[in-house]
């Protein structure tokens, strides 16, 4: 039977490759005239590529040994040509990776690391991504030790495939084998973080920056730009500003898109004065002419603080400078009008937008809908939809995602599912944001069984699961105390090449702590530290609060001490939980000592602080002290809330009852 008939259908296009010369043919003919038949080899590899790792060469089957001997005369360039052909399609790509160890075992071509690096480079040049399954299953190198060339090639492929966890492991291997990572390694890793939908994880960025400084590599302007962009997207404008200053100190100017990202981050943090100063320094006072995106970043800040006058002035200045506003510009202004309750002004702006030749898209209407959502006016979602249809604009995936989120936030799960069904009826495929929003809404609405059903439907739809998806499910399973499910979900997340972020670890600490599984909660913090990540104040607060709920004041105090040992200052929120822990344990003196500590360290007690102290006093029946604390709260400028007033009434009622008795 011909060898080509043994090949799977997906590999038949490769059967025409070079043929072996017939017996008796002169071997002195030019290589280009020589033909080699690779059909038997491809057929053999197609049946063995899914098998476990092959045995050492000394115990290889006779078939493979004979097959290898028949290809001993094939020159290196022909192996390269075959690899390129196999890498040309996703169907035959696994076969290309099966060929590499075959060549290595029989020493048929030069070092495997170089071959693999060449293959990865070919994929990169063609703009194709290395399949995730291959990234996870293929070893970093089939040689020992691995070469830095191969590790960097795999790192770049992992980054291109948006698999930062795999890229991080490869960076760790570089350091483990005492190879000095180059700037490209960090650039590739930052690219993988910036190419994801979610903001980069702050702890991961800190770890990367620390590693870069430890390696004593001097970042160039592109790497500084990537670092600034990453920290800005992670909502860490102070770190981004520090990096900007470091770049300027050595005479480097970051790319304009990095500066724009930083202006946007400052605006989002309501630090508009700093955003203005940066805009003036780099764009108006500098040699770089501001583009639409830079103006939009500044405009975003004005919208955030509700400064409509300044927002409108930005549009005027753009017109004077000859910079055309785009859809995002108008969207931000429409958003500002909607948030200010000026729906008619928003409608007028939509007409101006069309007059300027910028047709409003679904995104503009999604911003209007988001404005109503944030103002609590979810019922106006239907009016926005009507206005859309009147303007001849069809809802897209993003609009439906905002609509589902709007209904989900106000527990209108029926409307959310209707929007989801309508979306699919219109041929719009839900993405990871759609599924996450819908699953999370059902979790928060207490519909856990339905949330799990939706998660299963998401899997069946082949929609890729993201870190946020796993975080939602870990929280759900933790609330139901399904601990095996929690561990399985975390393991699956890592197997998919996703990096557990600060939210993942905080969720784990919270669900373990609230269930009294304190050992597991502490283990999570230690595991995070072992991974080189820094626990956040939120994580420590979750653990302090968990101990407080069970009256374990000493344990809560130890967590606060550990927090300070890690260089984190305890916030008012954390110390309020510590006061609650002492109160639950009936240790009033210690509870008031925390109040004194707050005053001495410049932390302003809030209404929760005083309410928690009043609750502690009532618990130990020191009712007469409650009015004193209530008076101190008012004197300090804290407005009593309903709970504080209820505490006072309760104490006064007990005091009156005791006097009567």
From Swiss-Prot:
One of its GO terms (molecular function) is mRNA binding. Gene3D superfamilies: Tetratricopeptide repeat domain (1.25.40.10). PPR repeats lie at residues 147-181, 182-219, 220-254, 255-290, 291-325, 326-360, 361-395, 396-430, 431-465, 466-500, 501-535, 536-570, 571-605, 606-640. Residues 1-57 form a transit peptide. It is found in: Plastid, Chloroplast. InterPro entries: Pentatricopeptide_rpt, TPR-like_helical_dom_sf. Pfam families: PPR, PPR_2, PPR_3. It comes from the Eukaryota. Keywords: Chloroplast, mRNA processing, Plastid, Repeat, Transit peptide, Translation regulation. GO terms for cellular component: chloroplast; cytoplasm. Its main location: plastid. GO terms for biological process: mRNA processing; regulation of translation. Required for the processing and translation of chloroplast mRNAs. NCBIfam families: PPR. Belongs to the PPR family. P subfamily. This is Pentatricopeptide repeat-containing protein CRP1 homolog, chloroplastic. It comes from Oryza sativa subsp. japonica.
């Amino acid at each position: 039977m011909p060898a080509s008939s043994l090949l799977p259908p997906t590999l038949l296009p490769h059967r025409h490759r070079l043929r072996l010369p017939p017996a008796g043919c002169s071997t002195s003919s030019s290589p280009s005239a020589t033909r080699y038949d690779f059909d038997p080899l491809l057929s053999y590899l197609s049946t063995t590529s899914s098998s476990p790792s092959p045995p050492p060469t000394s115990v290889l089957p006779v078939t493979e040994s004979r097959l290898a001997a028949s290809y001993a005369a094939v020159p290196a360039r022909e192996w390269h040509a075959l690899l390129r052909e196999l890498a040309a399609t996703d169907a035959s790509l696994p076969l290309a990776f099966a060929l590499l160890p075959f060549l290595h075992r029989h020493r048929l071509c030069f070092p495997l690391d170089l071959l693999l690096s060449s293959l990865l480079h070919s994929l990169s040049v063609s703009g194709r991504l290395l399949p995730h399954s291959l990234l996870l299953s293929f070893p970093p190198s089939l040689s020992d030790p691995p070469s830095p060339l191969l590790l960097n090639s795999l790192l770049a492929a992992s980054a291109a495939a948006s698999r930062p966890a795999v890229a991080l492991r490869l960076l760790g291997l570089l350091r483990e084998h005492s190879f000095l990572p180059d700037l490209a390694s960090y650039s590739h890793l930052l690219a993988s973080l910036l190419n994801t939908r979610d903001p980069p994880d702050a702890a991961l960025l800190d770890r990367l920056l620390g590693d870069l400084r430890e390696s004593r590599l001097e970042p160039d302007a592109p790497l500084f730009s990537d670092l600034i962009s990453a920290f800005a997207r992670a909502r860490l404008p102070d770190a981004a500003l520090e990096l900007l200053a470091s770049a300027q100190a050595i005479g480097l100017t970051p790319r304009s898109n990095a500066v724009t990202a930083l202006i946007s981050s400052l605006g989002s943090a309501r630090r508009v004065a700093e955003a203005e100063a940066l805009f003036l320094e780099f764009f108006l006072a500098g040699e770089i002419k501001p583009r639409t995106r830079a103006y939009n970043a500044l405009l975003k800040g004005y919208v955030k603080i509700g400064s409509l006058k300044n927002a409108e002035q930005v549009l005027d200045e753009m017109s004077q400078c000859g910079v055309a506003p785009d859809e995002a510009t108008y969207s931000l202004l429409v958003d500002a009008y909607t948030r200010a309750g000026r729906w008619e002004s928003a409608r007028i702006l939509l007409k101006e937008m069309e007059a300027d030749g910028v047709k409003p898209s679904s995104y503009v209407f999604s911003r209007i809908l988001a404005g109503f959502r944030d103002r609590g006016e979810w019922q106006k979602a239907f009016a926005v939809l009507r206005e859309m249809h009147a303007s001849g604009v069809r809802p897209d995936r993003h609009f439906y995602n905002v609509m589902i989120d709007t209904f989900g936030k106000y527990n209108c799960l029926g409307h959310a599912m209707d929007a989801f069904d309508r979306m699919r009826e219109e041929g719009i495929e839900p993405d990871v944001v759609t599924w996450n929003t819908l699953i999370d809404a059902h979790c928060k609405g207490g519909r856990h069984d339905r949330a799990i059903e939706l998660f299963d439907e998401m899997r069946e739809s082949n929609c890729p699961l993201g870190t946020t998806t796993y975080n939602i499910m870990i929280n759900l399973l933790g609330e139901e105390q399904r601990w095996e499910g929690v561990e399985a979900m975390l393991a699956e997340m890592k197997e998919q090449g996703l990096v557990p972020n600060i939210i993942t670890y905080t969720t784990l600490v919270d669900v373990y702590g609230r269930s009294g599984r304190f050992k597991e909660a502490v283990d999570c913090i230690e595991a995070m530290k072992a991974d080189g990540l820094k626990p956040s104040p939120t994580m420590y607060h979750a653990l302090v609060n968990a101990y407080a709920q069970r009256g374990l004041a000493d344990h809560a105090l130890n967590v606060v001490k550990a927090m300070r040992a890690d260089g984190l200052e305890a916030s008012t929120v954390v110390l309020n939980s510590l006061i609650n822990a002492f109160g639950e344990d009936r240790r009033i003196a210690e509870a008031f000592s925390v109040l004194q500590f707050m005053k001495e360290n410049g932390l302003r007690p809030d209404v929760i602080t005083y309410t928690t102290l009043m609750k502690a006093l009532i618990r130990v029946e020191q009712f007469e002290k409650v009015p004193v604390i209530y008076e101190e709260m008012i004197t300090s400028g804290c407005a009593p809330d309903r709970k504080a007033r209820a505490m006072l009434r309760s104490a006064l009622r007990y005091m009156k009852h005791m006097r009567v008795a």
